[in-house]
Amino acid sequence: MYAYENIEMSLNYIEQHLSEKIETEKLAEIACLSTFYYQRLFKKLVKKSVQEYIKLRRLAMVIAELNNSEERILDIALKYGFS
């Protein structure tokens, strides 16, 4: 399996679990890599750190929900782990 395929598996996991707590160790396990190597490879391929990428994806989801929902801002923010 190529390195980008390992990272792609973890990206899929991130997308499916954005409203949950996501641990870097779990992502590394999904990608079949050590945590250290996973973080280095992720940053090299995605051009962002793992946690920065997750935060930006969550912000994008919050923005989309704010535009398409009548839910309160606080409820949407809490749904995606912002406090």
What are these regions, as identified by a protein language model?
Residues 34-37, 83:
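Short coil turns linking two alpha-helices in DNA-binding domains
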Residues 4, 8-25, 44-80:
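Terminal helix-turn-helix DNA-binding modules in bacterial transcription factors
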Residues 30:
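Short, basic/aromatic recognition patches that contact phosphate-bearing ligands
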